[in-house]
Regions:
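Amphipathic alpha-helical scaffolding segments comprising HEAT/armadillo-like alpha-solenoid repeats
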Residues: 1-9, 27-42, 61-74, 93-106, ...
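Alpha-helix N-cap/helix-start positions at coil->helix boundaries
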Residues: 12-15, 46-47, 62, 77-79, ...
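Conserved hydrophobic register position within alpha-solenoid helical repeats
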Residues: 18-21, 52, 84, 116, ...
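Core register positions within helices of long alpha-helical scaffolds
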Residues: 24-27, 55, 87, 119, ...
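Acidic (E/D-rich), amphipathic helical modules within compact regulatory domains
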Residues: 46, 51-55, 63-70, 74-90
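Short, solvent-exposed interaction modules
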Residues: 106-112, 117, 122
Length: 172
């Protein structure tokens, strides 16, 4: 056995049904079928929901904010919520600030709180400043650091009086 191989690697085999569904998702993506991906946000498998979040953000733009915000607030899986926060940040619409702020303030996963803080910084609105300052005392060092990264970006945007591609590349 290779030293990095898990003893129970048979438990991590991806079912053929998931691979088949990913192929169907690719077809639906090529057809720009937003409704299909909106429906997949409720799929039982987190792998599918994670992909659906990213694809819906790409296909629907600002119209996806309401769906991604719901995922951020309600999905049971932290990875899916993290991807929703990331996608909302990349989209950059101020309509996502409320749900991202709630995630920073109360999500049970530091992983999600961290990404939501970064996303607020990417969006670049001063409306997020209070939430980000509150995150400076979060129990998680990663969240505190992410809040500082986001606050630095807000300060840079206000100093330069512009938002551009550079200001969306905060890392995190």
């Amino acid at each position: 056995m290779h030293p990095r191989q898990l003893k129970n690697d048979h438990l991590f085999i991806i079912p053929k049904s998931i691979i088949k569904l990913l192929a169907e998702m690719e077809k639906q993506y090529e057809d720009n079928n937003r409704q299909y991906f909106e429906n997949l946000l409720n799929h039982q498998n987190y792998i599918i929901r994670t992909r659906a979040v990213c694809i819906l953000a790409d296909l629907a733009g600002e119209e996806s904010v309401k769906y991604l915000s719901k995922v951020l607030e309600k999905d049971a899986n932290a990875l899916v919520r993290h991807e929703a926060a990331f996608s909302l940040g990349q989209l950059g619409f101020s309509t996502a600030i409320s749900s991202l702020s709630r995630a920073v303030e109360s999500d049970q996963s530091f992983f999600v709180r961290h990404e939501a803080a970064i996303a607020l910084g990417v969006i670049g609105s001063s409306k997020a400043r209070t939430t980000l300052k509150g995150a400076l005392v979060d129990s998680s060092e990663e969240v505190r650091q992410s809040a500082l990264v986001a606050l630095a970006n807000l300060k840079y945007i206000s100093t330069m009086k512009r938002k551009n591609k550079f200001t969306t590349m905060t890392g995190g």
